[in-house]
Amino acid sequence: MLNPDGALAYTRENANSVDLNRDAYLASQPEMKLLRILYEEFKPDYCYNLHDQRTIFGTEGFNLPATISFLAPAFNNDRDYNEVRMKAIVIINKMNRALQEYIPYQIGRFDDSYNVNCTGDYFTTRNTPTILFEAGHFQMDYDRDESRKYVFISLLSSLLDNYENVIVDNELDNYLRIPQNNKRFFDFIYKNVKIIDNSVEKIINFAAQYDEVLENNEIYFKAKISKVSDLEEYSGHTEYDCESMLFSENGINIPEIGKEANFYLNNLTEFNNGVKII
């Protein structure tokens, strides 16, 4: 684990408030200095860069969460494809084929914008084939149990018959056919909600998103209102048709961004932490 202090505090940043995944080239932090030393000593044939991914990501063209996303990171600003990057692509294609048997259309391809301070981009620039794994959301699996299973399947399939890592003509095409992952999900969307805005009744949609909060060494999911209206391009992992019922929260009849998603509809139907409970 590169960032034990950050893992303990449930944050990307280390004890010096530095995001280590933006420190690969500069190596200003002791953790990154140590990783660089280990890299030089070990001289790996491949690097696997494992991350979690937020629930907001889905696969482009499909109304499905991006449960696992991959990337063969770029080695230059033009995002060209060289032999090093193609070796990573061969492995990604192998993992994608394995996962399609379990979670079809829920495998995404991460954005390949180049930043040499990102760990994967740095190692690719150093001519080591590198694969980024992003473990995302599976339907109603907020504890990521299913996601971990599919990461394991990915890792196992990448290691089987790895001696056959031969680059054939259609490898790049197959890689680029993996749908781009994009920001298209909220944890909750509430549709057809009546509000009163400046004494005018309106029907709107609004969304809530979980904040992951560390309390007493436990992670708690706290739903907060995150977007009001303009949700045509988004889907919810959970969606409610509120059938023109009136929103109310402590006497206020309009949802406010940043407030906890605890409210009533028609003063009768209760939502607590985003979820309908009555």
Predicted features along the sequence, with ranges:
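Active-site/substrate-binding loop(s) of hydrolase catalytic cores
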Residues: 1-105, 124
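C-terminal accessory segments enriched in acidic
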Residues: 42, 71-79, 85, 90-278
